[in-house]
């Protein structure tokens, strides 16, 4: 299965390594037409106001929204911001793939970034992981159909709704594979089971 990584900003290589560990084929997405040859998409970290400009200029908003109707999307850090319903910053145009509102750079400057242990309720069990937060966004509101998979300092930091998954931290920096596995294996399997059952 080919999984695309939006290659406008962020660390493409670390996400590629995670996908390869799961026997998934990573491919870089630089143009909207690239979405036609993948079965899932990662929106990696970066700078959300810059990502807004780059995505707008390339015509990604309509293309990703259409793609996300039937395919899983995983967003990390700024990727979560782009997937959110509202970013509380008028400079940022979001995709509205997750019914959450976020506050950007809630954890401060990059020098204050931290790695902390988290317990994640995912794939039917609770799992401990290390999570690296870098100028991380804070989820300040979750809609009724959003599942909270992990919290940090009382706020959700990993959420799932339908086929989509948003994280305020960077699992790829710690070699954590469970979120990529959940998004691109478990959720895809559930989607296929529903299609066959219909």
How should these model regions be labeled?
Residues 104-198:
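Amide-donor transfer/coupling interface in amidating biosynthetic enzymes
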Residues 43, 75, 167:
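Redox-cofactor binding/interface segments in oxidoreductases and associated redox assembly factors
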Residues 2-4, 94, 163:
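Residues that mark the start of a beta-strand
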Residues 38, 69-71, 92-93, 128-129, ...:
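Short coil/turn connectors at secondary-structure junctions
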Residues 48-119:
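Cysteine-nucleophile active-site neighborhood
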């Amino acid at each position: 299965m080919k999984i695309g990584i939006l290659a406008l900003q962020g660390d493409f290589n670390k996400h590629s390594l995670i996908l390869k560990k799961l026997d998934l084929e990573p491919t870089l997405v630089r143009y909207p037409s690239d979405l036609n040859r993948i079965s899932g998409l990662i929106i990696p970290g970066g700078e959300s106001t810059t990502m807004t400009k780059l995505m707008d200029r390339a015509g990604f908003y309509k293309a990703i929204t259409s793609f996300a109707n039937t395919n899983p999307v995983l967003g990390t850090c700024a990727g979560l911001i782009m997937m959110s319903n509202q970013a509380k910053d008028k400079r940022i145009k979001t995709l509205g793939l997750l019914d959450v509102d976020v506050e950007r750079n809630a954890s401060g400057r990059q020098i204050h970034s931290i790695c902390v242990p988290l317990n994640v309720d995912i794939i039917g069990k609770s799992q401990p992981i290390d999570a690296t937060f870098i100028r991380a966004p804070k989820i300040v509101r979750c809609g009724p159909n959003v599942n909270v998979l992990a919290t940090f300092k009382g706020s959700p930091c990993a959420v799932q709704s339908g086929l989509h998954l948003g994280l305020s931290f960077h699992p790829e920096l710690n070699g954590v594979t469970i979120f990529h596995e959940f998004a691109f294996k478990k959720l895809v399997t559930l989607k296929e089971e529903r299609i066959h059952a219909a």
